[in-house]
């Protein structure tokens, strides 16, 4: 009898906030749904449309909003990890071309253990209905 396929989380509702041409950092938002029986650790973000990507957390420190690089984030078993404005988000750096509203961009999350989860993110001015806002 064969081994059961590994459980893989799903990346959905992905979007990137549109920005003026020449902008060097764009924010990406999505929901990582983890239907697995164990938590998963998100280690990195990559996209062929950007030179590099990072995971950032926004925190209020002494009344000031600050972003910091997060080396790893956890999506709980049977739960989700939300990347949303004002909170944890994907910082996509140095676009390889100017992106305009309506463009679709592949984005990939790298999980601990080597699993990769990917989706197309739409470039938008505002969050789509029922998305990571």
Tell me the role of every PLM-derived stretch.
Residues 1-133:
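Compact, glycine-rich, soluble single-domain proteins
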């Amino acid at each position: 009898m064969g081994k059961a396929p590994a459980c893989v989380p799903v990346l959905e509702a992905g979007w990137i906030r549109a920005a003026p041409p020449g902008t060097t950092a764009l924010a990406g938002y999505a929901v990582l749904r983890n239907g697995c029986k164990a938590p998963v650790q998100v280690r990195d973000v990559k996209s062929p449309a950007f030179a590099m990507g990072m995971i950032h957390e926004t925190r209020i420190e002494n009344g000031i909003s600050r972003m910091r690089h997060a080396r790893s984030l956890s999506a709980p078993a049977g739960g989700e990890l939300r990347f949303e404005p004002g909170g944890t988000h994907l910082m996509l750096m140095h676009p390889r071309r100017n992106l305009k509203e309506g463009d679709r961009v592949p984005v990939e999350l790298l999980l601990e253990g080597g699993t990769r989860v990917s989706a197309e993110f739409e470039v938008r001015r505002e969050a789509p209905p029922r998305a990571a806002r």
